[in-house]
Amino acid sequence: MAGVCAVKVGIIGGSGLDDPDILEGRLEKYVDTPFGKPSDALVLGKIKNVDCVLLASRHGRQHTIAPTNVNYRANIWALKSEGCTHILVTTACGSLREEIQPGDIVIVDQFIDRTTKREQTFYDGGPSCLPGVCHIPMAEPFCAKTREVLIDIAKRLGIKCHSKGAMITIEGPRFSSKAESQMFRLWGADVINMTTVPEVILAKEAGICYASIAMATDYDCWKEHEEAVSVDRVLKTLKENANKATSILLTAIPQIAAMDWTELLQSMKSTVQLSVMLPKH
């Protein structure tokens, strides 16, 4: 159909959710950006005849990049440069709610930022940055239309899925203290991780539809009589449940590609343009 925007889906894998075999006709592409190199090579290919670009792990192929040191700007810029209209990400997270059990999926709709050391904008006045200052609206950080697709697919597949949740992103790489975990619950956070911020913010600045499939692996450390979060426990739960996130991705991508996103993408582009304050000459 003339005038309909062609969909290309970027995929960012999280801890334990980084299988490049989901793509057909894979081609590795090493790229550079004005902000440096992304976490790993991009893998170009198709999922059910839909063009996709996979960044298999934001932490690097051997999980050598701490959450603080992930080059989020390069990752998002690289996917934008490849023409991605959407970014679907997977992330491990801790649950801050009794009802979100380990192994459950959460389609996140909000975030709380507790990071302290990360570049959060493409417009910060540096030599590689875009001109001006971008005051991007963040009332609805995640793409509602994309989230609806993911929620619908999860229900159809019979996967236990929470249709919303506020993700609090901490700096890491350490896990929370018990006092912090209890405080985050009082703040209204539902799940906790180390990577959603600034990824979701940068995607918004790039005018890309961004949605996150979060998998709860543990109860962090707030819950009495429950084993506190540990690397071993996170990886064990991921190994047992990673197929849930993969199934949602593989089923959702062709449905996303069949929809018309022209109006929404144009609206997002206009929002970015209206959010940038340029210097007066």
UniProtKB/Swiss-Prot annotation:
UniProt lineage: Eukaryota, Metazoa, Chordata, Craniata, Vertebrata
Subcellular location: Cytoplasm; Nucleus
One record GO biological process: L-methionine salvage from methylthioadenosine
Entry protein name: S-methyl-5'-thioadenosine phosphorylase
Site (Important for substrate specificity): S176, V231
Keywords: Cytoplasm, Glycosyltransferase, Nucleus, Purine salvage, Transferase
Homology family: Belongs to the PNP/MTAP phosphorylase family. MTAP subfamily.
HAMAP family: MTAP (MF_01963)
Quaternary structure (record): Homotrimer.
Residues binding phosphate, per UniProt: S15, R58, H59, T91, A92, T195
SUPFAM superfamilies according to UniProt: Purine and uridine phosphorylases
Binding-site residues, substrate: M194, D218, Y219, D220
InterPro entries named among the record's database cross-references: MTAP, Nucleoside_phosphorylase_d, Nucleoside_phosphorylase_sf
GO MF entry, a single one: S-methyl-5-thioadenosine phosphorylase activity
UniProt entry tagged with the keyword Cytoplasm: yes
CC annotations in GO: cytoplasm; nucleus
Class of the enzyme per the UniProt entry, highest EC level: transferase
PANTHER family, per the entry: S-METHYL-5'-THIOADENOSINE PHOSPHORYLASE
UniProt main location, coarse: cytoplasm
E.C. code: 2.4.2.28
Reaction(s) this enzyme catalyzes, per UniProt: S-methyl-5'-thioadenosine + phosphate = 5-(methylsulfanyl)-alpha-D-ribose 1-phosphate + adenine
Function (record text): Catalyzes the reversible phosphorylation of S-methyl-5'-thioadenosine (MTA) to adenine and 5-methylthioribose-1-phosphate. Involved in the breakdown of MTA, a major by-product of polyamine biosynthesis. Responsible for the first step in the methionine salvage pathway after MTA has been generated from S-adenosylmethionine. Has broad substrate specificity with 6-aminopurine nucleosides as preferred substrates.
Pathway(s) this gene product operates in, as recorded in its UniProt entry: Amino-acid biosynthesis; L-methionine biosynthesis via salvage pathway; S-methyl-5-thio-alpha-D-ribose 1-phosphate from S-methyl-5'-thioadenosine (phosphorylase route): step 1/1
